[in-house]
Structure formats: structure tokens, C-alpha cells
């Protein structure tokens, strides 16, 4: 795989959301969702944003991605702002396109990365399904295709919003291991949203926990596990208890 496109490894991401409010609709009053959320992300780190359902995790990710501009604050992605990829909860594959075509569509015609698509499809375990349409794939296979499409772009920033939700445990575990393999071979800055604390420990180098209600950063913790320990259930549970002991 070719190196990242001009990655400035010395430039962190700066996030400041002073206020994010959902406007009043009908009988529903305006709702303050995020307040004074501020943090910095080092390049090529894997930061997990966690917290209870409905606390604003996905909203925060949408703001960082530039999909939601109705907020008070500032997002500074530095030179990486033009090299950002978002992997959503749903795989978002075009039903009329094959696995290969769904991956290729994110690249311009003639892009040299197009030559790497077959190898990427093989790496995510879909070599025999390259010409299959999404309806013929299991949800786990569709999410493998989504990972391939995200990493073929060689992004400098990768945002992931609960991409392994609704999967059985063996499938989710397999996909988490695949994600780590891809990330280690192609380092990039990852912001990963999940409500699953065990998943947060297995993946993150750092965890940001949002508080419920008018969410702010309630906890900022470093995960002290090596790669082997992340695959050890006992080690993950011990680290999970250490980090989340007071919550």
C-alpha cells in the first residue's frame, strides 16, 4: 500500500464545541446536546468517543466531519481537512453495484489507487465476493466492504460511527481485528464512536467519555494494553474496570 498522501504527522486535530443545540420542533423544546466539549487529537492515534446512548457522540462526529455546521465553536483539522473519510453505522453500499464497483466509486477515474483495489478486497476477506452485489452479502461482509472502501482512500482522518453495531460477537470481534490490522499497516488518525465499553478498550489508544445530558468530556483516559492484550478477554476486562471504575 502506498504511503499516506502528504500526511503532516506533526499536526494535531483541535476540537472545540462550545454549544450544540437541537432547535425546538412542534411541542418539543430546544435541547442543548453538547456544551464545552474541547480536546486535541494527536496524529495517527486511535481515539474512541464513548458514553451512554443519546449523549451526543454521533452529533459530535458529524460536527467534526463538517456534516453539521449549526454549532458554536471551532474544528481545526489542519492540513488533513481535505483527506477525511467517514464510515457510518450502515455500510451504505449502492445496491446496483458490485463490491468492486462500490469500492472503486470513491476514486477518480485513472487514480493509481484503483490498481490496489483487488489487493484491498483480498485483505478484507472478500476476494470471492468481489463481483457480488450487496444483497448477496451478509451484514458482516457488507461492513468488510465498507472498511475496504474507507481504507482504499488512504485518508489522513478516519471517522467511524458505531460501524460494528448489530453484529453477533464473533463477527464483531473478527471485524475489530481486521480494523486493527488495516490501521497498523496504514496508520491514520481515527475517531471511533461506540457505546460499548469493551469495544472501546479493545480498539482505542485513548478514550474520551461524554457525560449524559448536556454532554461534555467527563473522562480522558489512555488505554494501557498492547496488541496481544487487546485480544485477551481478561486483560480487556481488567483495563475496562480500571478506566471506568468510577462510572
Feature roles, as predicted:
Residues 50-52:
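The feature captures the beta-strand-to-loop junction immediately N-terminal to the Walker
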Residues 65:
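Helix-to-loop junction immediately C-terminal to a conserved catalytic motif
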Residues 112-129, 180-181:
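Conserved ABC ATPase "signature" region
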Residues 133-137, 141:
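Conserved ABC ATPase signature
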Residues 147-148:
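Hydrophobic anchor residue at the start of the ABC signature
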Residues 152-156:
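A short, proline-enriched helix->beta-strand linker immediately N-terminal to the Walker B motif
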Residues 158-162:
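Catalytic Walker B motif of ABC-type/P-loop ATPase nucleotide-binding domains
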Amino acid at each position: 500500500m502506498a504511503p499516506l498522501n502528504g500526511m503532516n504527522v506533526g499536526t494535531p486535530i483541535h476540537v472545540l464545541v462550545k454549544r450544540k443545540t437541537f432547535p425546538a420542533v412542534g411541542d418539543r423544546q430546544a435541547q442543548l446536546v453538547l456544551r464545552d466539549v474541547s480536546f486535541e487529537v494527536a496524529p495517527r492515534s486511535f481515539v474512541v468517543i464513548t458514553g451512554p446512548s443519546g449523549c451526543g457522540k454521533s452529533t459530535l462526529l458529524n460536527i467534526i466531519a463538517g456534516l453539521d455546521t449549526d454549532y458554536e465553536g471551532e474544528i481545526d483539522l489542519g492540513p488533513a481537512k481535505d483527506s477525511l473519510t467517514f464510515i457510518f453505522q450502515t455500510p451504505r453500499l449502492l445496491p446496483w453495484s458490485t463490491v468492486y464497483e462500490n469500492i472503486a466509486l470513491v476514486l477518480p477515474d485513472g487514480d493509481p489507487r484503483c490498481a490496489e483495489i483487488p489487493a484491498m478486497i483480498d485483505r478484507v476477506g472478500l476476494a470471492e465476493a468481489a463481483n457480488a452485489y450487496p444483497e448477496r452479502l451478509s451484514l458482516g461482509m457488507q461492513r468488510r466492504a465498507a472498511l475496504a472502501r474507507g481504507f482504499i482512500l488512504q485518508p489522513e482522518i478516519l471517522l467511524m460511527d458505531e460501524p460494528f453495531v448489530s453484529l453477533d460477537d464473533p463477527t464483531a470481534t473478527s471485524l475489530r481485528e481486521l480494523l486493527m490490522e488495516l490501521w497498523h499497516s496504514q496508520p491514520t488518525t481515527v475517531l471511533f464512536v461506540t457505546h460499548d465499553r469493551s469495544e472501546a478498550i479493545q480498539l482505542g489508544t485513548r478514550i474520551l467519555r461524554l457525560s449524559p445530558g448536556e454532554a461534555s468530556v467527563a473522562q480522558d483516559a489512555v488505554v494501557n494494553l498492547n496488541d496481544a492484550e487487546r485480544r485477551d478477554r481478561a486483560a480487556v476486562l481488567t483495563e475496562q474496570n480500571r478506566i471506568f471504575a468510577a462510572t
